Amino acid sequence: MPTIMNCKHLGICGGCSSPQSAYADSLKAKEQILHELFAPIFPPSEILPVIPCDPVLRGRNKMEFSFFQTKEGKKSLGFITPTKPKQGVPITECLMIHEDTMDILNLTRAWWDNHPELTAYYPPFNKGSLCTLTVRIGSPERKLMVILTTSAREEYAVEKGIIEEWKNALINSSLPIVSIIWEEKVSAKNAPTYFRSHLIHGEPFIKQTLTLPKDGNSGVFHVRPRSFFQPQSLQGAKIIEIAKEFMNPQGSETLLDLYCGAGTIGIMLSAYVKKVIGVEIVPDAIDSAKENILINKKENLIEVYLEDAKTFCRRHQDCPPPDVVVIDPPRCGIQNKVLKYLLRIFPKKIIYISCNPKIQFEECCSLISAGYHIKKVQPLDQFPHSPHLENIILLEREDSL
């Protein structure tokens, strides 16, 4: 195995917290933390070994960079330190991202240097022009989507001609860019923040292909700027494989996919069940889900609803329960109001996928108190060299054991 050199930004940028050269050690540390966390409700010896990230380096399919500016006017485009006072880190290398992403970062820096009148956005005061630069990478072709987010406030609005300069710099490069999107962030006091999206080059999506490792079941997905998609494509397929094995489908099940995002889990698992119902609150994501259902010819197997999980569960609390509920919520977890109505639905099996095991543990305690039993726990790494760990748990109703 080749020697891996540590990144020069290690411990500074707020990304990696452990040396890139010591991946095995960081994996053991994550596993130990998970064992200690779940020991009160599940025997650590029965937790399955952590599935390592593959690839360990340059596997991230999405990365967001922040524009930053000091009071003295010093600019940076990269990451922002997690400690106070906040500082911008103008990264010149990153072992987590593809080299093409770094090229886009450098092209955008050069464009910003040519426009000193553009200031970095400062969220606390809603001031400044340039917010973030996001790069998404498709798989397996590694085509690129680039998203520039700027302020929509009139006094900080970026002229279309200046945006055109940025777009042309990207197009004139040799990079495989298939989508360029300009977003305007609309933010005001006592009003929800939203984004006006402008497609300025190519398609409004990138393609992601997922293939389950064991049986080769494959799906193609159109992912839009604000659609959720697992940050490591190969690991995302493994998560779905684990969910399938935990579900042990017989072909007659109804599956409820809460927080369905772009529909990836439901679409991939629809090959093994009778019916899938997907629920998602983000309009961009549900549009992607509907599109992906058609692309994969699953319209007779899957229904999706633009609705928050709590409202959906409340509306269906008196209906026959689904056989399996798959939950892949944001970092904040299911939350009490959703949990309350989920327990009224009372499905036989719950497969809980989480990127925040601490919240997952707390909510599993509530599920256990309500009559569920943890059957299996499978951790998986998606964020090498960081403290974050994905965890997949199978819970079954005690009366169905």
Curated annotation (Swiss-Prot):
SUPFAM superfamilies: S-adenosyl-L-methionine-dependent methyltransferases. [4Fe-4S] cluster binds at C7, C13, C16, C94. S-adenosyl-L-methionine binds at Q230, Y259, E280, D328. InterPro entries: MeTrfase_TrmA_AS, MeTrfase_TrmA_CS, SAM-dependent_MTases_sf, U5_MeTrfase_fam. It holds the Pfam family tRNA_U5-meth_tr. Gene3D superfamilies: 2.40.50.1070, Vaccinia Virus protein VP39. The active site is at C355 (nucleophile). It comes from the Bacteria. GO terms for molecular function: 4 iron, 4 sulfur cluster binding; metal ion binding; rRNA (uridine-C5-)-methyltransferase activity. This is Uncharacterized RNA methyltransferase CCA_00883. It comes from Chlamydia caviae (strain ATCC VR-813 / DSM 19441 / 03DC25 / GPIC) (Chlamydophila caviae).
